[in-house]
């Protein structure tokens, strides 16, 4: 198509000239704002001189006006003294016209070839079609060009999307529909799942199977799970699946797309003669699945790790081939990160549940009986002693007490002598070979003694002991923390705050408590684990204790669901306030003369980065909701 440039303003023509001549000569021209230009519409500076470009949009004035204007410009051109001068014009030029202009412009013009008339510019537009698209003033009023632009846009929008490479390599090769398909190696485990409920588990399971040498496919690998590539995924399953893992829960098995995929998998298994082609994975309890018969599902309800081991064992027993060359597909991680919280380079202060150890005894002592001794009587004497001890060997024990204290406490059992005084840190880090105690046993013995000291301290201060499956916790008694009472915590500098350790909700009384676990790495500290107990509200301060573990679990999931992190942290600080009283430390007696001192305030850590999530929950440090549950709409939640 030939353009006459009549639709362009003078500024538009200058811009077009810079782009065309710049593309043709391979140089970039500077652009200048509207106004006096000293004979320049574009300039390219070089060490040995400048290249000057001037554009003259004289279409309607014709060659005569252009010639007169160039005579006026001659003085400016000579003053600029460019190494090279280039002229563009919208006026059509003959060879004679160019010769006339060459004489007028003078020595700055290298030759007639540096004069671009309308025909020359049209030639450049044909050579650089992308410049045509960039200058819509050329074609905005041209029906043929507009039709071409719209047609190309529609064709591009309607073009079928390219199948993701991860999926494309599993599909049958293209060919005639009735052409026989060459048999290929079945080497891919397909996962049938519901989105998005099963995405997290799939992103956890698939890389671990690939690490074992299995090739795995699920729709999240396309980075667009769901219906987008359904037909292609079905084709790939028929073509390459060696096994199919079905994630089972009633809610997902009712999905029509899951049922369709399962039907295809069962049909494929029948064609292959593999009755165990589909391996169900139990994510929740589910009803019997038609077509799977009595197939036993691999259980992932209790523990994902145990389920993975059973699944790998199942695949090995069914002789599913593995490859040492299998690489973990990076798309698993790419999809997992799509919902990740962005990190920013701003430090953030973090709270913790660690209490730093401030003081500890220098030595632990080993006492041994000088004669024969009854172990039962020795254990009874240790229990009566009231401070931590640990039996070692047949006739001795470890303790922190001094010689006079031990002799007096154990005189009814036998005569004990101090055999070894061992540096405490050396003992926990290296054991004590003279007593045949290795490092791990030594560490365990000291941990047990420190736990005993914590238990004794909590009991003496009126806290209620409760045994959990993985430890002993202590809760404030109804006298220490009555139902609905706020326990103040914090110092005056950060304003005094308060939290509840006991309150009523959903017809039950909940009570907050703590389990303490001593640890030596990376430094000595106590780690606190929050606990919540429930009692049926029978109008008594303590209530009727709920002992059923399943009911306790349901109550924790429902009642504590509305508690935010700051509420949990506030309860922990309120508990420590009761535990330490007016002191900044908790002093655990290890003997009549030795104490183990831990700080009563949890440690603060600093992270070099933080997230962009908002943190506007400061008002919840002071519990405005009387139920402290963050669920004020519940009819059964009591207040003060």
From Swiss-Prot:
Domain of life of the native organism: Bacteria
UniProt KW keywords: Plasmid
Family annotation (InterPro entries): TIR_dom (IPR000157), Toll_tir_struct_dom_sf (IPR035897)
Gene3D superfamilies recorded: Toll/interleukin-1 receptor homology (TIR) domain
Biased composition (Acidic residues): 616-626
Record PROSITE patterns: TIR
Pfam family, one: TIR_2
Domain TIR residue range list: 184-328
A GO BP annotation: signal transduction
Positions of the UniProt region annotated as Disordered: 613-640
Protein name in the entry: Uncharacterized protein y4cD
